[in-house]
Amino acid sequence: QSGFTGGAINAITKSGTNEFHGSVYSYFQNGDMVSNKYEKHDGSESADYGDMTDWTLGATLGGPIVKDKLFFFANFERSKKEYDNAFSTNNGMSKIDFGVANQILDKVRTDAAAQGVTYRGTLGTPKEYTYSDKVGLKLDWNINDRNHASLRWSFVDAKQNNKTATAKNLVTNDYAFDFCSKTSALVFELNSRIGDNMSNEFHASWTSVRDKRNPGDPFPMIQISNVGGGTLCIGNERSSMANALDQDIYTLTDNFTINAGRHAITLGTHEEFYKFGNLFCQDLYGTYEFSNPTDFFAGNINRFRYGQAVESVAGTKNWTPKFSAGQFGFYVQDKWAVTDNFDLTYGLRADMPIMFDTPLENGEFNVYAAQKGWNLKTNQKIAVKPMWSPRLGFRWNTLKHNSLIVRGGVGVFTGRVPFVWISNNFSNTGVAQFSYNTYNTDGITVQYNANNAYKADPTVNPTTPAQKLQTINAFDKDFKFSQQLRANLAVDFKLLGTNWTVEGIYSKTLNDMIVKNYNVIETGKTFAQAQGLADFGDVRPMFKRGDYSGIYVLENVSKGYSYSASVKAEKSFDFGLDLMASYTYGLSKTINNGSSSVVASNWQYNYTHGNPNSPELAKSNFNIPHQVMVSAYQHINWNHNPGRTIDNKTTIGLIYTGNSGSPYSIYVNGDLNGDGGYNDLMYIPTDAEVDAMVAKGLFVPVTNKKTGAVTKTPEQQGEDFKQWLSSEKYVKNHRGQYFERNCDNEDWENRLDLHVDHKFGFKWGKDIRYIQIGLDIINFTKMLNKKWGATLSQGGFNYYSPLSYGSMKVYKVNNAGAVVESKKTGYQFTNKGSYDMRSYSDYYSRWRMQLTAKLTF
């Protein structure tokens, strides 16, 4: 197998038989089945949950078309989930100042109307929703005794709204776009026996994916920071103004196996062909960023971004780059039964990725890159080279009766690169599509009419796509698909009537993705030197930006590894009790998590305290070091007559999960090192270093815009900062060090779930039907005690920024008695010696019930 470096899922679909069988099932949950409030760590309570509905209805049917020859199996499922967004109203959950937010929205409407535009957006995203329909059909054909064929078709139609309001981000309803996805798949399989010792498996498939974002009316994105304790976003989300992805994927697989004595030799090939069309034009209607509400009302734009296709080249502003690629795989494997109780499997696989199309040539950039000594061209493709994957595995049934099995293996696994990254190279050549990103906003005003989003001004922005200030994406000439070396060793054994498994897994990165921005250049100074601090531990390198907005290059890195060790015990009793307990310890370190579909974002949001083009190896965004699972299921059979064949059984289960909290990082809100990335991890200063920062004038006073009065002096900020540094659990023990990316985890989390179901059968004619009714209470822990079961960022990771750095506005009264404004670069710590570093997952921190019902016939 290939195409993955993490885990692979092999699914077996149901088939029809000579008898008609089917099922109807449903899952249901509403707002009355979710706890109204939950208690936080500080004793405060959450807001009411609000209304919600979550249901799924499905049906299956299978049976014969021609008895013993041709069968069918069909399924349908519809799901609908709607719930209130807790952060869209002024209920205390949001950190946004709703009064100021409404004033901003009123001004947007007024200014837009003055330009002939009616803005219909409203604050908040009251309803969140996910809808989906799933349909499937499978045909099985017993051609003859030696040949079996199947044809499988599936279709999924889904819609979900995204970018909705959070605790620190309030958005308008048109900012929260609909993500619509339609997926069709057709799979044909033919399994054949050839003679007495040979067989062949043939597999062909086609998958079509049509993804599209549907924003509101065309409107620029207006982003205002520091609206209370968060950010307000109005209009279309910048990455969704023009965003659609079409994918067609074709695969062919053939495995020919020869059984020769103790050897089963497989020769095979797996071919993949891809066709992509990716409409992606960020900032098509313009994106205007303001540092605070005061700047917004004054029209002081902090940052302006704009992008569109060059109509003279692409023919339209909404240009869809298209390209095709493939990956050809060939392999040989031998499964050797060395003895009756020892199997050895070994083989070799070669994969060859290939791109059939070439990005457009940007001659000016290619010359520029050559002058810089870079081996880069916009019209450069991935080199066609085989990627080898040798593998070896074994299974040793040591005592020949399955009471002690040792198994393991080692090998190389070749994956793919998300092709949406490759599509960036076709979009961002600086020829057919251009983008601007500037902090030099003099003369720029907000254009609310989407057709007037950009007006070329040679003194501010270039007028031709070949000029600089462009965003360029390119490949390193030796860029490879991802590869991992992986090894595992496990022991399965029985002891005291209990089944045990002990397993260890280790993975080492051979090729992984890293994004470098060639447009940032080291100045030769450190941050401490730039600030004039002689004995200051923050010695991160300083940068300046080059001639382009960004030059993002996909390269490979071999740093990174992960390992895990686990132990699991399972025991079943004759009276119907099943017990399971497991513990897993793991560690995962990466250079870049690659969690964004935009290549530039994978550079910008890869937090570092050093060179962003050579980031330090750090814990993964998804590193959960400890996990404990315990389950107990009691099955009660109410049939006292053992001879009865109709089930009448109740199952009661308790499932406990305990794990380390989500990883988190602390960064400085600003651009410390001048690279434009805003991704600088915080240096944790000592008290003496904080005092030196204050003495050097690096803290900027907080002042009142109306009166010019100082509301928080640099000295007060320094004292409050020291108080926070001495009280935060991780920070206080790492003074004089950098906060490494994801170096700490949130508090340990405990969750107990309860499951109850009853299954009973009844006769309908000659057949037996079954009805199963179930109730799940998820996070039952919270129902037992309101102080338990809180969850921080379920399944994700957190970033916190208690300290700000940048060009701060300072107001003071001049000699004439007027309040005047000036700017000073430095730090501000506006908290009062404390900073809340807990971001609760509102839904997952509540107990919730789910009802299930299923009829089988």
Predicted feature locations:
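Hydrophobic, lipid-facing positions within transmembrane beta-strands of outer-membrane proteins
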Residues: 5-7, 55-59, 133-137, 182-188, ...
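Acidic, glycine-rich flexible loop segments
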Residues: 3-8, 14-182, 196, 208-214, ...
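Extracytoplasmic gating/loop element in the C-terminal half of outer-membrane beta-barrel translocons
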Residues: 649-767, 772, 794-837
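Gram-negative outer-membrane beta-barrel transporters
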Residues: 501-661
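Transmembrane beta-barrel strands of outer-membrane/channel proteins
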Residues: 24-30, 74-78, 151-155, 202-208, ...
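Short loop/turn motifs that connect adjacent beta-strands in outer-membrane beta-barrel proteins
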Residues: 1-2, 16-21, 66-69, 146, ...
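Solvent-exposed loop/turn elements at secondary-structure boundaries
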Residues: 361-389, 394-555, 695, 747, ...
